[in-house]
Amino acid sequence: MADSSPASFLTQADALLRKNLVFQKRNIWSNIRLITIPFFLCLLLLVIQMLFDTQFNDVHGQCGCNEKTCGLRYSTSEQAAFCAIPNPPQWTPLLQIPAPEYRAAIPYPSHTSPATFLFTGNNQSLGNILMGNMYSNSSGFDGDLAYYVLGSSSFPAYTNHMDSAFISDLPIYNIQHECSPNSSFSILIHQSPLAFPKEVNCVQGLNLWRNSSSDVNNELFKGYRKGNPDKKINEFAGAFDFQNTNGNNLNVSVWYNSTYKNDTVVRPMALIRVPRLVNLASNAYLEFLKGSETKILFEYVKEMPKPETKLSLDIASLIGPLFFTWVILLLFPVILTTLVYEKQQRLRIMMKMHGLGDVPYWIVSYTYFLLISILYMLCFAIFGSLIGLNFFRLNDYSIQLVFFFICINLQISVAFLASAMFSDVKTATVIAYIYVFGTGLLGIFLFQFFLEDPLFPRGWIIAMELYPGFSLYRGLYELSQSAFAGDYRGIDGMKWRDFGNGMKEVTCIMLIEWLLLLGLAYYIDQIIYSRKHPLFFLLQSTSKKKQHFSDNKISKVVVEMEKPDVCREREKVEQCLLKSTRDSAVLCNNLKKVYSGKDGNPQKLAVRGLSLALPQGECFGMLGPNGAGKTSFINMMTGIIKPSSGTAFVQGLDILTDMDRIYTTIGVCPQHDLLWEKLSGREHLLFYGRLKNLKGSVLTQAVEESLRSVNLFHGGIGDKQVSKYSGGMKRRLSVAISLIGSPKVVYMDEPSTGLDPASRKSLWDVVKRAKRKGAIILTTHSMEEAEILCDRIGIFVDGSLQCIGNPKELKSRYGGSYVLTVTTSEEHEKEVEQLVHNISTNAKKIYRTAGTQKFELPKQEVKIGEVFKALEKAKTMFPVVAWGLADTTLEDVFIKVAQTS
């Protein structure tokens, strides 16, 4: 038994989900191609990686060997970095001393310029003592480098397997209070199997007091090339802030030049020579407390053992941000064009008019896109891991899961939001791909440049990350850098403990944007698509009552200007409105639609205060010339546009406030067929039947009956895809869709357009049966169709209802004459005209062309028999090719009303 109640949320969601699954099944190969895109892109990365490996993996990119043995002794300086080091060497700890030409000095640096240290604190005298304890006063070399304060101006290495200071041509510096002749000496550094002779040159250590840490910061910054107007480098060796240090407490902050770490994309971060600075401050304090004999010797720094390696370049991690941005964003055009296609083809409004609510549509559509995106990203990550891409293999998979999940949800939200701005698929597609490729290019050439610039304000970075494409790029950049560094150092990539390196920031931004943009997209959809008031969630029922009251006042102004039958219809409507219960299927109360003028044009009154009462079981026909307002009326009744004033009630529900409930009771056959080409006729009816709350055997039976009624059952036509249907078959399917579920009110816009006579007659029988169960509003240009189907007809001209009544009443009211048609040769037209005036003195010629003339003969002046006698007599006087006498047709009534209005 059929359930007449509206379909529940779950029923609507089930109907849409089933339809989408069938539709995607028909597009299975397109979906497979989409899912396999990551596989081929990962293969492309693998090929690029192999090409780079082939280029780099020659003898210069690996440890040197003789016939059987590999090691440092068989390696060149280029090959030594790749050799295994089971017992790493011990290197004397050094300070980072500026090169002579860059040292802070007045008036300008030279090779004798001192290495300057700034210091500050709460107690200047204590600071002077501590800084005085920093350097040794020994002269000559006693064999133990740990007692000397040594430094180098060479750039530090990335590991301590080989200290660049001892293998470079630059000297080692011995920092002294004052340089004596014996302060410089030569040493030989033994690191089996190698030995490095080095010159140790004395450099004076100059300590300068500053009053505050702010002064220290200011002077350090001015020593930077961009920190002074002369663009000169005046570099300090270091700085100390002893703060509240006293005899019971050591509290010191150390400044050092962090630019030596070379933390760029081109090469990994170097080890900065900071430990010796901390050791100097500690030993200076110990000497202050215990005397000069108390020291903690910092004897050496030593790297962890390393295996033999080969020169490799993780190209996938290096180009990952650009490449992976494009890969992930390729889903955006797919989602956007799908949403815009449904809007362009008006498929969504068709579903909405048959009862599909906005919430089920959003949830099912969003879930579908989310599942496709998840499957896409899973394939991407799995394929990337299987072929060994470090981006996936080294970074924590749980971090990738969280990041990609938030990312694809944000992308879907952006697509829903963007779909409100487009009504054409081609335009949306072009803009979407510009967004995809433009984001990648701007990311690598603009955003990444600012991201790696340490002077670029962090606030601006966050502002740029508000653009979803840049937030995606930033996350991929962080993952790529972690994978690259992990591969270089032989460790894992990003772990949760590393999540604060920018990843946390961008993940929070994307999460917040996902929720905000999704809510904004739904709000805009309600405003633009569902035509709701911008403050629809705040409106109260009082506005509704106020609107109805004003409408009733307006209606009295226009009554006197209307014709009697139209006035009677308006009075009927007003009487119905006064009743507590409204039995009419459709009740229009002074419905008006005004389109605002554009480009200086005046306003367009499309519908001028229409009042109409349509009872159950009636078929009402709307006739009128193009532009009369019929389509605007249908669009208002189906919720596509809002009335400028007035309202209408469908089954007692107001179109201004209850449109969602009205959709569950109506059926619509639009002027143009709104169908899915990949679905069959049966699948269309099953979908719309479920929206009408039909289930089980009732649904199956209703679909079978619908297919039979419109001649789409036999020969398996109903199971063929709509793309194989003719225009007439599609039209019949549209009619069947509008009638399935026995809706209480059906709107049919030219339902028989494009049908052959047999199909048209069959369709008329279907409509006749349907009106027994509800009311039908039908627009047509076929007078025959209107006369056969419609119980009442209304003729619209220039937005106004000019007359209303059943076909016989209208023909009687507007057609009190016969139409006489006579065809002769042109030279006898005068004789024909004289003959007609002899029959009726008030005869009126309404048509003339090439010897054929039409005349209107008032019925009260002529008898049909006299007309026959007169024409038979005329045949004896001049040749009459043809003649005919006809009663007034509905078409004549239509033409007369249209011309006189």
From Swiss-Prot:
SUPFAM superfamilies xref list: P-loop containing nucleoside triphosphate hydrolases
Principal cellular location given in the protein's record: membrane
Gene Ontology CC entries for this record: membrane
Entry keyword set: ATP-binding, Membrane, Nucleotide-binding, Transmembrane, Transmembrane helix, Transport
Pfam families recorded: ABC2_membrane_3, ABC_tran, ABCA12_C
Record-annotated membrane-spanning stretches: 34-54, 315-335, 369-389, 402-422, 427-447, 460-477, 508-528
Positions annotated to bind ATP: G624, P625, N626, G627, A628, G629, K630, T631
Entry GO MF terms: ABC-type transporter activity; ATP binding; ATP hydrolysis activity
Record membrane topology: Multi-pass membrane protein
Localization, UniProt: Membrane
Domain ABC transporter: 586-823
PANTHER family: ABC TRANSPORTER A FAMILY MEMBER 8, ATP-BINDING CASSETTE TRANSPORTER SUBFAMILY A ABCA
Family classification: Belongs to the ABC transporter superfamily. ABCA family. CPR flippase (TC 3.A.1.211) subfamily.
Protein name: ABC transporter A family member 8
Native source species: Arabidopsis thaliana
Gene for this chain: ABCA8
